[in-house]
Every structure is written in structure tokens, then in C-alpha cells.
A protein has these predicted regions:
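Selective transmembrane helix interface/packing segments
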Residues: 1-271
Length: 271
């Protein structure tokens, strides 16, 4: 039992290790080549697919691909229209990009756990994680980009003086004694937005990836009749969790998109 436990522990640790340059040990400032590579490839494929569908779009009866794209566009535009009351020409495409990009990165969790590591090992790459959104560095990078957009829209809608006035006078009032409490509360609110975005997405996807690895450990646990029983339980568990996980990856992509729209809308509107 101890050896089996150690084997499973080593298996999980191996699959949870990122590909970094120069054998870096990681940390917040580490460059995770696997997360960057997978996210960029998925982003390029998503943009290329939409570009091809846009080129082939017709005014007549749409094909299945065009109809699917139009459904997604209408769905995302409806979400933006319900929340944001300004010019949607920039925020609409941004929301679409966020939703589909995060969804595709989440969907990498549905690949067999050992598939990409097995492929990369053929090229001499020891570690390779397939799910960028299970990397806290990646989710924080995306949430900090949203944070920059929040600040940008705040200055754009209210001006520098108007935004600074809001930081010191909302929500308690304009009295000088309330300036510092107002400012501190607004700082906490601002900081909580990127943190909540990053941690929510990371936590759900990291947990989902870990569950897949624990289930995969059943495939090699035990021998004889017990081993085959665990193997069958692993297949059933993998299938059931995979079906349930489709809902999770869709909801998390939707939540990230909606919160991005809400936060930017709050920055755009005057208090």
C-alpha cells in the first residue's frame, strides 16, 4: 500500500509540474512554457476558425458552422447588452474572445491525462501540463488584464479628476474625515476584482484536473481481479466526471466573461 501510494503521489506530482526554462523551480514570476504555448495555439485556432467562417458567411441559409457562430455571437451580444449601456463595439468582441478562449483552455481538461505528456516525452520534454487555466499564473495574467481595462474605462468615462474624486468620496460621502475610509474601501474593492476572477477560475480547473488524475490512478492500482475491478471503476468514474466537467468548464468560462463585463460596466458608469 505504501508503494502504491508513493507511486500515485509521484504520478500526480509529475503531471502537476510545469515546463519552465532552465529548470526553474517556479513561483509567481516563473515562465510556464506549456501554459503559454497551449493558450497561444488555442487563441490562434479560435481566431482562424472565426475568420474563415466570416469569409464564407452568406446572407442566405447558413451552414452549420455559420449558424453555430451566429448563435454564439447573439448569445454573447445579448449578455453585453443586458449589462453594459455604452458603446459595445469594443466590449462585444472582447467578451466573445474571453468566453471562447477561456472555454477552449478549460476544455483541454477533457483530454486524457497522459496524452500530451506522452506526446511531449517523445520529443524529450519531461513535463507538460495541458490546461492553462489550471495554472494560477495564467489566470492572474488574464485577470490583471481585466484590471487594466477597469482602470482604463474608469479614466475614460470619468476623467482623471472625476475618477480620483470618486475614489475619495464614494460610498460614504464628501466629508474630509471620510476620504481615507472611502479610499481604502475602494482600494479593497479594486484589488478583490482581479483576485476573485483569477482564484475562482484557477480553483475550479485545478480541482477538476486533480480529480482526473486521481481517477487515472485507479487504472494502474492493484493486480488480478481487484486490479480489473479498479480499472473498470476508473473508466466509469472518468466518463461520469468528464460529462459533469463539461458543465463546469462551460460555467466557468461564462462566469469569467460575465464578471469581466460587469466590472468594466461598473467602471464605465458614474456612481
Amino acid at each position: 500500500m505504501a508503494s502504491e501510494s508513493g507511486g500515485l503521489t509521484e504520478y500526480i506530482q509529475h503531471h502537476m509540474t510545469h515546463l519552465t526554462p532552465h529548470a526553474s523551480k517556479g513561483g509567481f514570476w516563473a515562465v510556464h512554457i506549456d501554459s503559454i504555448t497551449v493558450s497561444l495555439v488555442l487563441g490562434v485556432l479560435f481566431c482562424l476558425w472565426f475568420w474563415l467562417k466570416a469569409r464564407k458567411a452568406t446572407a442566405g441559409v447558413p451552414g452549420r458552422g455559420q449558424a453555430f457562430v451566429e448563435i454564439i455571437l447573439e448569445f454573447v451580444d445579448g449578455q453585453v447588452k443586458d449589462v453594459f449601456h455604452g458603446d459595445r463595439r469594443v466590449l462585444g468582441p472582447l467578451a466573445l474572445t474571453v468566453f471562447l478562449w477561456v472555454f477552449l483552455m478549460n476544455a483541454m481538461d477533457l483530454l486524457p491525462v497522459d496524452l500530451l505528456p506522452w506526446i511531449t516525452e517523445k520529443f524529450g520534454i519531461g513535463h507538460f501540463r495541458a490546461v492553462p487555466t489550471a495554472d494560477i499564473n495564467m489566470t492572474f495574467a488574464m485577470s490583471l488584464t481585466v484590471f487594466v481595462l477597469i482602470i482604463f474605462y474608469s479614466f475614460k468615462a470619468k476623467g482623471a479628476s472625476g475618477y480620483m474624486h470618486e475614489l475619495f468620496t464614494a460610498p460614504f460621502g464628501k466629508h474630509p474625515a471620510l476620504w481615507i475610509p472611502n479610499f481604502l474601501l475602494n482600494l479593497v474593492e479594486l484589488a478583490s476584482k482581479p483576485v476573485s476572477l483569477a482564484m475562482r477560475l484557477f480553483g475550479n480547473m485545478y480541482a477538476g484536473e486533480l480529480v482526473f488524475m486521481l481517477i487515472a490512478g485507479l487504472f494502474s492500482a492493484g493486480a488480478g481481479v481487484a486490479g480489473w475491478a479498479l480499472y473498470g471503476a476508473g473508466i466509469i468514474g472518468y466518463t461520469v466526471w468528464g460529462i459533469f466537467h463539461i458543465l463546469i468548464i462551460s460555467i466557468q468560462a461564462f462566469i469569467f466573461m460575465v464578471l469581466t463585463i460587469v466590472y468594466i460596466s461598473m467602471a464605465h458608469d458614474h456612481h
